[in-house]
Amino acid sequence: MKKLFRGLQLTGMLALAGVAHAQRALDLSRPNYYPRVIRLSHGTNAGRLLASFDAGKAGALYESPDNGKTWQHLTDVAEPTPPGMCCSGLFEVPKQVGATPAGTLFWATSVGTDKGGRGPCSIRLYRSLDGGRSWQFFNTPVSGFIGLWEPEFGLDAQGRLVVYYSSEERKASGYNQMLAHKVSTDGGLTWGEEVIDVGKADGHLRPGMAIVRRLPSGRYVMTYEICGLGCDAYVRTSPDGVSWGDPADPGQRIESTEGHHFAHAPTVAWAPQKGNPNGQLLAIGQLLLNNNDNALAPANGRVYMVNTQNGTGPWTETPAPVPVPDAKDNPCPNYSSQLLPGVDGLTVLEVALKFEGSTCQAFYQTAPLPAAPKPATRPRR
């Protein structure tokens, strides 16, 4: 009965969310894929939101001056490498690293990975020093001949720049695909040796799509999918952003108190929460599946999950600002959706993809974040 009540309660919340929050299309003039959204923190750009999308042979950049209420096209980053690009990442350098000043923007994308029969491929890095208005090619952190995907950036505990990515380059050693990283001590000018973060040399499993966030405690959290295990979403932690434990350990599957889990293209964000020094982690995946039979859950495409214990323990389902009820295994609907919490931890902006007719479009909306549970009070005598 308790579970039934909770299900009815969530259904009601979803209905209210759909009424109270009218989602808006970001730009109906062109298809958009693989969203990334960040809040800029430096100089005259502080407070602006920046979003990037894969748009054919270019990265499409948009800006919002009003915390995500409205968006305008800013520029395109042309990437000429045939046949096209995929799975781009967007990052603002939070402090000076080597010769790279704070506020530098990096945008990186996978190229050459969709050629028939495969061939030379790489992750190409572009840099902007003016808040995303103009971009120049910077360098190539990773190159190969089979497949390289999904660049993600961060700073480790030593303040070094790290690029995380998915790689198929070690198939001959048994890694069908793995998650790896490289470290730069000079702000991205040069890159160190490859380190495997998640991977098993069984010729089968395909971990991918890493997202990394630093927690207030100084620890780091990574979410990712593992195809070969249903493409389910997993989480693991690190003390320093570069030491992630035994790579063959799959980590902890992200499961809700409702008996569901995410599959495909997970992302994670951290938000402050009043009264909770840990803050809260917000995770979302493309599909919501039942734990018991892996069938689509009734709330598929309609929720994200919240965790207040640094990624351990239970996750709680919460209505998504942009519901995508027809989410399915496809590179458009609800694929790699973005959650960007407000600086005060009271709201969250979601940017999610949906089909508008036969065209993939980005939609956005802001909604309240869950408040911290109130501490229990002693009854008066």
Where are the regions a protein language model picked out?
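Bacterial N-terminal signal peptides that target proteins for export
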Residues: 1-11
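Basic polycationic patches enriched in arginine
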Residues: 6, 380-381
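Sec/Tat signal peptide C-region and signal peptidase I cleavage site
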Residues: 18-22
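Asp-box/BNR beta-propeller blade signature and adjacent active/binding-site loops
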Residues: 23-378
